[in-house]
């Protein structure tokens, strides 16, 4: 995991973004935020399992589906299976050691 800090690469309303093998953070102080970094590490694992391009295709398709379903961009984002897995487990710093392959499917 390579961390890059840049205010200009992160969309408004977000603190981090992962594009394997990089984690982009908006604020330098977040390099010490274990919960945020664990959230992004979960996304790295998801991207490794699916390969990067299929991950983002699935992500975009599921976001579009959730946007139609919820009619709210924030609700759509929070209900993407990848995000649900990451948010549900970000505080468990041992989660990735026990995580099953394609675990995000349980969040569909």
Role assignments for model-derived ranges:
Residues 2-15, 51-108:
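Metalloprotease/metallohydrolase-associated module, dominated by Zn2+-dependent proteases
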Residues 4-30, 34:
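Active-site scaffold of zinc-dependent metalloenzymes
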Residues 33-46:
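Short alpha-helix carrying the canonical HExxH Zn2+-binding catalytic motif
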């Amino acid at each position: 995991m390579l961390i890059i800090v840049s205010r200009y690469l992160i969309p408004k309303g977000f603190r981090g973004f992962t594009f394997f093998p990089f984690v982009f953070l908006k604020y330098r102080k977040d390099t010490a935020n274990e919960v945020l970094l664990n959230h992004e590490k979960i996304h790295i694992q998801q991207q490794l399992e699916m390969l990067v391009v299929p991950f983002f295709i699935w992500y975009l398709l599921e976001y579009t589906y959730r946007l139609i379903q919820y009619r709210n961009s924030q609700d759509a984002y929070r209900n993407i299976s990848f995000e649900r897995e990451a948010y549900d487990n970000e505080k468990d710093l041992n989660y990735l050691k026990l995580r099953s392959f394609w675990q995000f499917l349980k969040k569909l």
